[in-house]
Amino acid sequence: MSKIANGNWNETKWQPLRAGIERVVFAMEADTLCCTIGRVENGNEVKPHTHPNEQVALVLEGECDYYVAGVPYRLTAGSWVTVPPNVEHYIHVYDSPVPCLQIDIFTPDRPEYTESFTAFLAEEEGK
């Protein structure tokens, strides 16, 4: 059963994923969804991928092109796009005045994200 939880991503360490991309996983106590906030720098490595999860990508700051099924969607602060399950997609940040800050909501849950982020936090605490 899901637990009630709260927090502030500004008070959490950011997990580096690859050059120019880092994230915080939150709502880890939820049973049926996963939420992340990502910070993506200009010139990020473009990495097309698919997954069985439905996804909503919502931009809070900055700008990006978000490709879904080969179609580019220009996202600015307040913009969002949905990604159906198993559809190729990726983010491309190349001319944003600030790093692109975006929230991703996935359903069903992404336990691999929770496990990876939990391990990252434990490693950081051990330093």
Regions found by a protein language model. Give the residues of each.
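A generic "binding-loop/recognition-motif" signal
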Residues: 42, 52, 71, 87-88, ...
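Hydrophobic alpha-helical segments of small multi-pass membrane proteins
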Residues: 54, 82-83, 104-108
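Short acidic-glycine-tyrosine-enriched beta hairpin
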Residues: 70-86
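Double-stranded beta-helix
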Residues: 18, 32-33, 38, 90-127
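A short, N-terminal "cap"/entry segment at the start of jelly-roll beta-barrel domains
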Residues: 1-32, 117-127
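Glycine- and acidic-residue-biased ligand/ion/polar-headgroup-sensing regions
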Residues: 53-64, 69
